[in-house]
């Protein structure tokens, strides 16, 4: 091994440094004798590593690792405008004028709730001339339950949320949707971001554990998962841990921490030792389905389930005994179909079989089945009558089985043990509480206080080459002082390592967590972050366009209680946010062609889900039901035929049950909804902070030919006809108000009426769905 603590002579590291093994290290020259002796003594004394190493880049030399400074805004009014204006003045750029009120109301609705305003909502704002009309509009939208659907979707991208496992089997995750609803609810309640992270990383280790905090731990469990049991493929555990670390790194810290799995990070000061200390903080996890019921309800469920199991087991034993003589009579005829050597092997008593005979006999005996209908045909009438009576009684008893208790698919750590008759598969907590899925086994907690299983440094990331045992820890370059590594709860039933990890992440001394989140919020309002690489604040990422503003926002975010809604208010009340997007200034274009300095508002194409939701809202078909189990919109049979495994509970008809908001669509990793995938739905296997935005021909083809779009165009036409029967001009005006939140101008009205003179109203409605103005926020 490279390093054997306590024995330098068996450590390849020492032997190569001393020239005892080839190739001698380091390359280019031998170490001094005193250095070689120091290495020998260090290894012989246990190779204790205190982590005191100078990183390649320190917090003093790289902007992202420095603690934020609450800079004084360089001007009056909204501090955002002061910081942005300073950069514009330095470049001699004149900003765009304010956008129209009609543009602003549509922008606000799409930004905050992901739905266009109705004509009445638009008119209400346009007619409200009070000085605080804009602020009151923002408050109404932040109070809407649809706010959580819109902004929760952004976090679900980061959390790589899906309703299936992925890979070749892509099995269903029947309780994953509860995590989605938790996220939506947390955004609606404006749960402070630091608490939001605590609940997701260590919701089972907090002082006050709630059903919501247990559901929240599904964040770490959202990884894609192969369909093999961990006990058969232990290396999979390291893949899941790597996914957790990658998600925490990219999604929370804005760092590619996973790049340090096999070696020190090539660009950022993240050591391989840091990676495995983080892994040790997570290593004790087990997947559990936390029952979301009170202890008394769980006890009652267990009691009734045990009674049903006992009675059904008793009846099945009687039934098997009744069938066994007939099964024994039918088996010889089935064995006779095999070659003579196989029949001979079966005929030899089990204790006397040779290894070869044991292999042959075992394969055949396990593979041969006598089916119930075969037994029925040879049974005596009185036995057949008794069999049917027993089967009916079993069915009757099964009907008394209590419904499965609701559970949260999350994680915990603790001394969980499989029951002797369990398959040793994925755990579910609490003896006697079953998971809703068919897989899994009963578990029970072991006695006493929890002992974390050992985790190891993996040499070159190889799970088969373990180095020194690791203790929990954090990324050194952004760690100040000596934060606790474990915060075990009083019960002692978990390690408290994840709680300590969460507290380190949300500590005011951590320079990245708040900085990354305010940058994400900024990105979703402006289409580009102050740091454009949302998931990478490291050396290979982009530098901030407004570093002083980013620092100020980070400190404000923490000072305002980590409130995301406070950040929305701050951003949306700025003149920077309210600027027009259509502003062709030659000087500004030449000095800042990418609009990095925000001299105008950045026009943005809507996300895939918002395009679908807007179509439903405009057609009048949108089902606004909040939360619950996922929906399964209709997918073409040809696409379903390509699905390898898993389920797609196709709706019987493309109707209201499937016309809910897109955040509730079943997210199958192996089969994204084609309509959404075309418009850049992100890969659900990895954390995604910023979606790709493409412009490809298939998007136009989908909007022209997709069955869903055509159906909604017809419903849109029906809505126009019902509102203004036979009056084409009123229908055109209403169509513009519904789809674009403005009336048509004279030229648009004339073109629309000319179109309707030759085409159907549904064709005109279809055209409205294809307009760039409908598909973009301006």
Question: Which residues make up each language-model segment?
Answer:
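A structural supersecondary motif
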Residues: 666-669, 677-687
């Amino acid at each position: 091994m490279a390093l054997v603590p306590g024995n330098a002579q068996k450590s390849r590291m020492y032997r190569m440094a001393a020239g005892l093994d080839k190739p001698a290290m380091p390359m280019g020259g031998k170490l001094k004798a005193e250095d070689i002796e120091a290495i020998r003594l260090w290894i012989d004394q246990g190779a204790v590593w205190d982590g005191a190493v100078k990183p390649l880049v320190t917090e003093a030399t790289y902007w992202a690792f420095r603690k934020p400074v609450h800079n004084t805004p360089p001007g009056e009014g909204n501090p955002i405008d002061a910081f942005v204006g300073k950069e514009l003045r330095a470049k001699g750029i004149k900003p765009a004028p304010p956008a129209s009120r009609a543009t602003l109301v549509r922008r606000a609705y799409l930004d905050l709730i992901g739905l266009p305003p109705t004509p009445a909502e638009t008119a209400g704002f346009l007619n409200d001339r009070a000085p605080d009309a804009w602020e009151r509009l923002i408050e109404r939208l932040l109070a809407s339950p649809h706010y959580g659907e819109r902004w929760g979707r952004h976090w679900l991208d980061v959390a790589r949320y899906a309703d299936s496992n992925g890979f070749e089997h892509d099995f269903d995750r029947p309780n994953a949707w509860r995590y989605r609803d938790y996220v939506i609810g947390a955004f609606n309640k404006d749960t402070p971001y630091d608490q939001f992270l605590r609940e997701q990383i260590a919701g089972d280790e907090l002082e006050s554990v709630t059903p919501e905090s247990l559901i929240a731990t599904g964040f770490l469990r959202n990884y894609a998962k192969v369909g093999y049991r961990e006990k058969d493929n232990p290396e999979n555990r390291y893949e899941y841990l790597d996914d957790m670390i990658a998600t925490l790194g990219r999604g929370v810290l804005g760092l590619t921490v996973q790049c340090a799995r096999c070696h020190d990070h090539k660009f950022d000061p993240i050591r391989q030792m840091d990676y495995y200390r983080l892994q040790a903080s997570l290593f004790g996890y087990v997947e559990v389905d936390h029952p979301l019921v009170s202890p008394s309800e769980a006890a009652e469920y267990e009691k009734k389930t045990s009674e049903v199991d006992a009675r059904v087991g008793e009846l099945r034993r009687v039934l098997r005994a009744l069938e066994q003589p007939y099964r024994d009579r039918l088996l010889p005829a089935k064995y006779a179909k095999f070659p003579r050597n196989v029949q001979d092997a079966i005929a030899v008593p089990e204790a006397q079989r040779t290894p070869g005979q044991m292999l042959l006999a075992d394969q055949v005996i396990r593979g041969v089945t006598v089916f119930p209908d075969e037994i029925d045909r040879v049974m005596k009438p009185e036995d057949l009558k008794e069999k049917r009576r027993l089967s009916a009684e079993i069915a009757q008893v099964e009907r008394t089985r209590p419904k499965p208790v609701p559970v949260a698919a999350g994680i915990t750590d603790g001394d969980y043990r499989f029951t002797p008759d369990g398959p040793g598969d994925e755990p579910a907590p609490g003896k006697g509480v079953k998971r809703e899925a068919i897989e899994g086994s009963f578990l029970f907690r072991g006695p006493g206080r929890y002992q974390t299983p050992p985790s190891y440094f993996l040499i070159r990331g190889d799970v088969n080459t373990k180095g020194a045992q690791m203790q929990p820890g954090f990324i050194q370059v952004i760690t100040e002082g000596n934060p606790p590594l474990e915060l075990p709860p009083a019960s002692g039933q978990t390690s408290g390592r994840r709680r300590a990890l969460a507290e380190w992440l949300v500590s005011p001394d951590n320079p990245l967590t708040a900085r990354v989140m305010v940058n994400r919020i900024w990105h979703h309002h402006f289409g580009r972050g102050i740091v454009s690489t949302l998931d990478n604040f490291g050396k290979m990422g982009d530098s901030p366009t407004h570093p002083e503003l980013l620092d100020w926002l980070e400190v404000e975010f923490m000072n305002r209680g980590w409130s995301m809604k406070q950040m929305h208010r701050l951003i949306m009340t700025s003149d920077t946010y309210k600027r027009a997007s259509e502003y062709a200034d030659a000087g500004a274009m030449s000095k800042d062609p990418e609009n990095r300095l925000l001299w105008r508002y950045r026009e943005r194409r809507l996300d895939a889900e918002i395009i679908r939701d807007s179509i439903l809202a405009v057609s009048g078909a949108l089902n606004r039901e909040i939360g619950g189990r996922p929906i399964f919109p209709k997918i073409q049979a040809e696409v379903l035929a390509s699905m390898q495994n898993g389920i797609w509970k196709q709706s019987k008809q493309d109707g209201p049950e499937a016309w809910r908001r897109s955040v509730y669509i079943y997210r199958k990793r192996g089969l994204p909804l084609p309509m959404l995938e075309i418009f850049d739905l992100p890969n659900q296997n990895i954390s995604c902070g910023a979606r790709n935005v493409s412009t490809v021909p298939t998007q136009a083809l989908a909007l022209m030919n997709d069955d869903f779009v055509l159906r909604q165009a017809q419903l849109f036409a029906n809505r126009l006809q019902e509102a203004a029967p036979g009056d084409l001009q009123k229908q055109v005006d209403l169509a513009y108000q519904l789809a674009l939140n403005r009336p048509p101008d004279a030229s648009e009205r004339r073109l629309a009426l000319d179109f309707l003179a030759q085409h159907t109203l549904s064709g005109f409605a279809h055209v409205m769905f294809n307009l760039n103005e409908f598909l973009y926020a301006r």
